[in-house]
């Protein structure tokens, strides 16, 4: 069966922020107004993970294989749901005991890093980055062509063809010019992450960070968004997920927050890796502001009052 509405943030994740009717409060980052919506209607686009039909061979068109990325993501999400529930159950148990404890073991950390990597690469924000990049290349090529028109003696210029790589799906038979189509390029990126799983570069970076699981006992709920993984850079050392001193945060629910710390600057905390900590009100507020500033468009909350955060 063809799936029309495809999510770039899993519903099993959004459910942790929703009420029993699976409804969640939504706000656009450009306006303080909020509204209640079912999680099935947010963080999604029609056919977001479909390969464009014009890029498929006749054989694959007949098999309706344009949705293989969506199918793979759905299969992974079933495992992600179980892993997420395990972490929440563990944190609830630790919270009851009111003491810091190891939340997960090293093997589970590596396993969960793959889910985080997949979330990072599959969002609308990532799609936009690819679109901006391809537009910049197109603009540059046009300017160069215009320059050559006015300077005939200048040597011909062309962009090198990309080197083929193995993906999670056998792409033999596809007629894809990925370097010229941002959406297809993004789908290749998602597919590559699916294929490599915990062995992907992004997964390894996350697994190498120092993890703290924050418990929010304040009256302010943790927010999430259509780009749930956010980055807090250290001084001027860059905003990459492996930049020196960077902190990468991922809200698990209104009460729980995973914060990953780059392990060279934060090396003194290695002995506390994978343990729980209590979040202060300032920490919760700081994280919520990151969600608002780094979302693509929408912020999600378990409560209607987003308060003074969205300004």
Sequence positions of predicted segments:
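Alpha-helical structural context detector biased toward long hydrophobic helices
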Residues: 1-5, 9-311
């Amino acid at each position: 069966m063809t799936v029309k509405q495809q999510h770039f943030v899993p519903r099993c994740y959004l459910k942790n922020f929703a009420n029993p009717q699976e409804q969640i409060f939504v706000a656009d980052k450009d306006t303080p107004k909020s509204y209640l919506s079912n999680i099935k209607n947010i963080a999604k686009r029609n056919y977001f993970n479909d390969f464009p039909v014009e890029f498929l061979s006749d054989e694959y068109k007949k098999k309706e294989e344009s949705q293989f990325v969506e199918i793979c993501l759905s299969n992974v999400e079933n495992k992600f749901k179980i892993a997420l529930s395990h972490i929440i159950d563990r944190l609830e148990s630790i919270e009851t005991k009111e003491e810091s404890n190891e939340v997960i073991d090293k093997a589970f950390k590596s396993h969960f890093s793959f889910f985080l990597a997949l979330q990072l690469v599959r969002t609308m924000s990532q799609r936009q980055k690819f679109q901006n990049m391809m537009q910049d290349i197109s603009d540059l090529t046009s300017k160069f062509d215009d320059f050559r028109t006015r300077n005939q003696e200048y040597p011909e210029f062309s962009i090198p063809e990309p080197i083929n790589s193995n993906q999670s799906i056998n792409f033999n038979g596809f007629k894809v010019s990925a370097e010229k189509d941002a959406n297809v390029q993004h789908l290749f990126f998602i597919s590559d992450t699916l294929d490599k799983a915990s062995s992907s570069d992004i997964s390894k970076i996350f697994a190498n960070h120092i993890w703290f699981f924050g418990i929010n006992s304040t009256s302010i709920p943790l927010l999430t968004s259509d780009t749930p993984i956010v980055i807090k850079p250290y001084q001027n050392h860059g905003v990459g997920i492996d930049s020196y001193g960077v902190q990468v945060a991922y809200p698990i629910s209104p009460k729980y927050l995973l914060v990953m710390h780059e392990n060279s600057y934060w090396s003194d905390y290695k002995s506390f890796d994978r343990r729980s900590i209590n979040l202060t009100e300032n920490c919760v507020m700081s994280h919520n502001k990151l969600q608002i500033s780094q979302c693509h468009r929408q912020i999600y909350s378990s409560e209607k009052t987003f308060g003074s955060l969205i300004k």
